[in-house]
Amino acid sequence: MSPFAGSTEKWWESLRVLVTGGAGFIGSSASRAFLSAGHEVAILEDFSRPGSGANLDWINEIGTPTVYEGSIVDSAFVNSCMAGFKPEAVYHLAAQVAVTLSVQNPRHDFETNALGTFNLLEATRTHVPSAHFVFSSTNKVYGDLARYPILATNSRYSFQEPRQGIQEDTPLDFHSPYGCSKGAADTYVTDYSRIYGLRTTVLRQSCIYGTRQFGIEDQGWIAWFVIAALLGRPVKVFGDGRQVRDALHIEDLIRLYDLVLSSSASKKTRVFNVGG
């Protein structure tokens, strides 16, 4: 089966696709899928997360991407990659992804998420202004959503108005250093479209899980619950356990990534909430 099963339109034969964080959990699945579809893929990766080397080996089973090893915080490095590869699409997935770690080291969180995104936007604007810039954002940009009344049942919390939902035009309300850094990046991506005419898509994702997610207690909770259960380790649940999260399998997210490119993009910037 094609990694992009379900796509209704394919308007290109082959694209040069740059994936930042391309050997991470989401990035490795995206990189492998793009290679399977016949695209030319470059991975920008610092290999700081455990498992990223094994993920690259998994990608190499399908094809051989160009690998740029370095940090998105390094502006000169980012510009060199962008100028050398000349991508037609940029999937920006590299990030510091844990709320807890953002509290422990807010500078690292800011530099990775906010400054790193800024560097990529500037490099795109300078070297490949026609490229499609796709940004992996987060539902954390909406804050705690305390403005919406909720009901507590015996097993879960739910909106008082069942059809309420969270729309893309919900006011942003950054909480935690992680929420602030990702929110700043999210805002920069949309504004670079308005000001400089870049073609951008922002995907505000929730809880993604699936193959090759090397979860830890601070991040990747579904994988961590499975790992902890297998190893007989205790699982910490904060609050009263009635919290509700949207969970989406990685294969479904990758199908969405394809649809973002293959669908009509008449607007310069698009923002989508990605639930489960």
Please give the residue ranges for each predicted region.
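Alpha-helix N-cap/helix-start motif
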Residues: 52, 102, 214-218, 246
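Short donor-sugar binding/catalytic loops of nucleotide-sugar-dependent glycosyltransferases
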Residues: 47, 241-244
